[in-house]
């Protein structure tokens, strides 16, 4: 299984659309910055057919150290990003050889 990095994404989009990689890099970085800014503010990001990104509050909990299970570890409350895939993405992942 391969990893799609930002560098590979820029290269692929640049080649597919015959756009200079620097222009693609600028647009992608701006897109990522805007997404990050929105999530930091607590906004929900919805991309139809792709999915939803939103910030959720994780409650504090007690964990265990695997090396010493007798000693509890207190994990504080925190904010985290949750991704929920859209219907189309779910369908494509469930049946990877069939594209629609």
UniProtKB/Swiss-Prot annotation:
UniProt keyword DNA-binding, yes or no: yes
Domain of life: Bacteria
InterPro entries xrefs: Hist_DNA-bd, IHF-like_DNA-bd_dom_sf
Keywords (A to Z) from UniProt: DNA condensation, DNA-binding
Alphabetical list of CDD domains matching this protein: IHF_B
Residues that span the membrane, as ranges: none
GO terms for biological process, alphabetical: chromosome condensation
GO molecular-function term, one example from the UniProt record: structural constituent of chromatin
Gene Ontology annotations for the cellular component aspect, listed alphabetically: cytosol
Family: Belongs to the bacterial histone-like protein family.
Role summary: Histone-like DNA-binding protein which is capable of wrapping DNA to stabilize it, and thus to prevent its denaturation under extreme environmental conditions.
Identification of the protein by name: Probable DNA-binding protein HU
Gene (UniProt): hup
């Amino acid at each position: 299984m391969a990893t799609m990095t930002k560098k590979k994404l820029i290269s692929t989009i640049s080649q597919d659309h015959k756009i200079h990689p620097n222009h693609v890099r600028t647009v992608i970085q701006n897109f990522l910055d805007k997404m990050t800014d929105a999530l930091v503010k607590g906004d929900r990001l919805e991309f139809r057919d792709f999915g939803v990104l939103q910030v959720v509050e994780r409650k504090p909990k007690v964990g265990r150290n695997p090396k010493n299970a007798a000693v509890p570890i207190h994990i504080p409350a925190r904010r985290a990003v949750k991704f929920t895939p859209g219907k189309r993405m779910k369908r494509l992942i469930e049946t990877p050889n069939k594209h629609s």
